[in-house]
């Protein structure tokens, strides 16, 4: 049974595009269906969180709006001199909750997600994920692209499985 839901941001919660203003400000587009899916999971007692390699105030604001339980900014796939990896962050959350990685659903789309996707019990990726990600043994390739409701597709499957 899934006891924790974690996801990457770019390419999963967003379409992977980055919008820049003339002043150099960055904007990201999030799908409201994905946000509602995580709200519904939290209401069902399943904590939710984000693991991203970016240090993004946009992502922080989105996580706060959704009242997500966990937010790890600036975590990558490789340990950079004292920095936490995505897998390390996932393990830290599991330790806090007293669960194993096999009870975690993670959605990722790029090579910096491979370690986490290979370790969790329910790995998922949008169809726009990198070929290396789609090739992970046991991964569930979603029908919906990132940023267009991919996360909602997963959260609905999790909730339907609990009924």
Predicted region positions:
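Alpha-helical substrate-recognition element adjacent to the catalytic core
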Residues: 1-84
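Mg2+-dependent phosphoryl-transfer enzymes with acidic/Ser/Thr/Gly-rich catalytic loops
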Residues: 65-66, 70, 76-163
């Amino acid at each position: 049974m899934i006891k924790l839901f974690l996801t990457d941001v770019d390419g999963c919660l967003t379409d992977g595009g980055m919008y820049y203003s003339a002043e150099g400000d960055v904007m990201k587009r999030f799908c409201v269906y994905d946000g509602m899916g995580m709200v519904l999971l939290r209401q069902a007692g399943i904590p939710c969180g984000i693991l991203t390699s970016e240090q993004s105030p946009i992502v922080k604001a989105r996580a706060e709006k959704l009242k997500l339980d966990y937010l790890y900014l600036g975590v990558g796939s490789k340990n950079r001199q004292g920095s936490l990896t995505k897998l390390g962050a996932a393990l830290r959350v599991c330790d806090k909750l007293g669960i194993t990685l096999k009870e975690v659903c993670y959605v990722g789309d790029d090579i910096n997600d491979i370690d986490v996707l290979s370790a969790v019990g329910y790995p998922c990726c949008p169809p726009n994920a990198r070929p290396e990600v789609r090739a992970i043994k046991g991964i569930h390739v979603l029908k919906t692209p990132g940023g267009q409701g991919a996360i909602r597709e997963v959260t609905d499957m999790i909730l339907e499985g609990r009924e």
